[in-house]
Every structure is written in structure tokens, then in C-alpha cells.
Amino acid sequence: MSQFTRISIQQAAALLQLPSVCLADIRDPSSFNAAHVTGAFHLTNDTLPQFTQQITKETPVLVMCYHGNSSQGVANYLTSIGYEKVYSIDGGFEGWRHVYPYTATV
């Protein structure tokens, strides 16, 4: 079984420049709707079936939560169901928003 890799927000930003990389944001709906990285997939228990249908097991998946803790559990789960390249972003959205652009609603 493969394992996920913990990466920095800088490494995540670099990976997101590559084609066919998925950013999965696992924060709660109100936080996600208020602000998120443009193009992020909002991964929840409800959207998991859609995620597994749309995102192939070979697609690199970057998992983002608030600070980089909860994302590790989800990253571990994704590897356990066969995703081959899974990354947990240390610092999460809180780290990202201080350095990189994101979409916010007023």
C-alpha cells in the first residue's frame, strides 16, 4: 500500500502548476464557500462518490484542510482506497492564504 507525503504550501503551489493535479479541500462548507483556492474540489463525505468517479487513481491529489492536521487522515484514507500519489499540505488553507491567491466571496 502506498503512503501519502506531507508537503509545504510552496511545494503544493509548484505541483498545482502541473497538468492534471487535483486539489481537494476538506474544510467545512461555510469555510470553503467563504474562501478557497481557485479550482479546488470540495471533498466531503457527500462529494466522495463524485470525487472517486471524476478523479482517477493515478491523478496526483493534494489534500488541504485548515492547518494541515485533518488533511493527513483524509490523505491516508485516499491511499487506502487506491490513490497512488497523495499529498497532505502542511499549514493548510491558513498557511496558503497568507502567501498565495485564493477565491473569496464577500
From Swiss-Prot:
It catalyses: thiosulfate + hydrogen cyanide = thiocyanate + sulfite + 2 H(+); thiosulfate + [thioredoxin]-dithiol = [thioredoxin]-disulfide + hydrogen sulfide + sulfite + 2 H(+). This is Thiosulfate sulfurtransferase GlpE. Belongs to the GlpE family. GO terms for cellular component: cytoplasm. Keywords: Cytoplasm, Transferase. It comes from Tolumonas auensis (strain DSM 9187 / NBRC 110442 / TA 4). Residues 17-105 form the Rhodanese domain. The active site is at residue 65.
